[in-house]
Amino acid sequence: MTSDPLLLTKENFALAEFEAEEIYPRIFVVHDFVRPAEIEKLELQFSTMNEEDWRVSYTESLYRFIEDQYGVRTFEEAQALGHRIELDGEWVDKNAIIQDTSLMQTLNERLAKIFAGLPGVELRGVGSIQRQYEGVRLNYHIDSESNPRVLYACVLYVNGDFEGGELHFPRIDVKIKPAAGDLIIFPSADDYLHGVLPVEAGPTRYALPAFVDKRED
């Protein structure tokens, strides 16, 4: 097995007892990674949330991100340390913290198995639900531009019955329309600039993002 932490291969999935499809070099899909019963628990949470719940949860998720990344709790403290923090007004109602901590732990332990054989990496696991309703898109970006430690992005899909909302890699001309329960993993590199196309009328798109970082020794 390679000692290069960037080179995730199908062997890593096999050792973790997952069957992965490599749909493009270094883009992997694992079907049914999130189990039906787990999907039901997640659906129960966001089905009971109102718009104010989403807004409050988004703000709390930002505070957690700042604390995790910079070791401080407020925007002012992070900015005083020289970090640039920007609030995206379009996303204030689109992220919610996963309330079922047991489920969150189960998903992260399962995900960590895939990367267990790679030295020098650490999982920044799922912790929030991301939603995109009609007209909402995720702009093109490379995750390591905001955090240079990011090696891989992981996206777990709660549903796949939405229209539009494809994961799009414009530089390699790849579009992915996931199914419920799918896990998609891809590297944070220039060729893998990516975004999510606008969701059309109908069901909302729900996904759980996670990242794999280069460990700071």
Go through the PLM ranges and name each one.
Residues 2-118:
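Non-heme Fe(II)/2-oxoglutarate
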Residues 18-19, 119, 143-145, 197-199:
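Beta-strand elements of modular eukaryotic interaction domains
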Residues 34, 46, 158, 212-214:
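Short beta-strand segments enriched in hydrophobic/aromatic residues
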Residues 118-128:
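A short coil-to-beta-strand element that immediately follows conserved catalytic motifs
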Residues 130-146:
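Conserved short histidine dyad/triad with adjacent acidic residue
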Residues 145-146, 150, 161-217:
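Catalytic core of Fe(II)/2-oxoglutarate
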